[in-house]
Amino acid sequence: MISGGVSIIGNYHGVNQDYFISKPYKDGHIIVVSDGIGSKSLSHLGSKYICESVYDVISNYAFDLSVISFKDIIYMCHEEWKKRLVDYDLKECYATLLIVLISENFIKAARLGDGFLTIYADDKVSFLYDKKENYFANETDCLKEVLDRDNIEILEMNYLKFQGALVCTDGIEIGRMQEYDLTNFTKEFVDEYSNKSQEEVITEIESWLVDWPGIDDKTLAFVMEGEN
């Protein structure tokens, strides 16, 4: 497996409000990405602590994840997030959440808020992305004091052949953000980079992501089949 990511601070930002983790756990791999809400002064802490909470809760979970409701797992992550932020004003720590959990024969993914994730398996690309159907462009769902389970979008699948997964914050827009745009981008990314080393992949992503249009923070995390 090749995994990693790149996060670039946006123009005019004092601190990068995005955070990501992409690394192995037990028999699988976790990608978790979060974008701190721009209007919140401590949202960079919110994004950091939810990524760390998700990784720690899932990697230390003692039971079979394949039979547990993923929303229940996210609830546990949310509770851990609140514990880690107990010394801060939680109202200033709101953040989005994107997760891909790749296990030996199943994948679970979740989205709360903007950004997108894609999963390339069995020669098909599946995705979760923010269609902005019920919000203005700068509005989104996010982690707050109470977890809004109804607005968590879940994707679960079994697979035979895993090829890759990408998770991006909303600073990275792909074309017109339609399903064919996400499908083509994912396939091209995996085809281009799956035969390169982690160091080569990260260096090349940095070279073009720094010039990506837009002034927001930009984060892309990935995992692909290939040589580490």
Predicted regions span which residues?
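N-terminal entry segment of metal-dependent catalytic domains or homologous docking segments
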Residues: 1-56, 115, 145-157, 214-221
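PP2C/PPM family metal-dependent serine/threonine protein phosphatase catalytic domain
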Residues: 2-15, 78-88, 119-160, 196, ...
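Acidic loop->beta-strand submotif enriched in PP2C/PPM serine/threonine phosphatases
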Residues: 14-24, 29, 90-104, 108, ...
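C-terminal catalytic subdomain
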Residues: 16, 84, 148-228
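Short acidic-glycine loop/turn motifs at beta-strand connectors
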Residues: 24-27, 102-106, 120-124, 224-228
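Generic enzyme active-site microenvironment
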Residues: 33, 112, 168
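Short helix/loop capping segments that flank catalytic or ligand/cofactor-binding pockets
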Residues: 41, 119-120, 175-177
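Catalytic core of PPM/PP2C metal-dependent serine/threonine phosphatase domains
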Residues: 50, 63-120, 152-159, 212-215
